[in-house]
């Protein structure tokens, strides 16, 4: 779970530092994918009793919110054709 969460922020940072639209989009999409991976790992952790129901709900909501924000960022970049930070 830690690796997936770290991958989200690392890919956002790397995408932010890229100049080309395609590179930015690629890293933001990778970050979003890591968010979905984290959601799966949270479910497995709950199912194997490594997380309580309360912890699962809180962490899943944070992950969903982050994933939605990333989706909006990607949509905005595509819609506006932004190529700079």
Question: What kind of region is each of these model predictions?
Answer:
Residues 2-85:
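Amphipathic alpha-helical assembly/interaction segments
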């Amino acid at each position: 779970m830690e690796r997936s969460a770290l991958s989200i922020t690392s890919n956002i940072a790397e995408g932010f530092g890229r100049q080309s639209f395609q590179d930015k989009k690629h890293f933001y999409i990778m970050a979003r994918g890591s968010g979905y991976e984290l959601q799966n790992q949270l479910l497995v952790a709950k199912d194997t009793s490594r997380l309580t129901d309360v912890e699962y709900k809180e962490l899943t909501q944070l992950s969903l919110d982050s994933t939605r924000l990333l989706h909006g960022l990607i949509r905005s970049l595509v819609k506006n054709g932004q190529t700079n930070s």
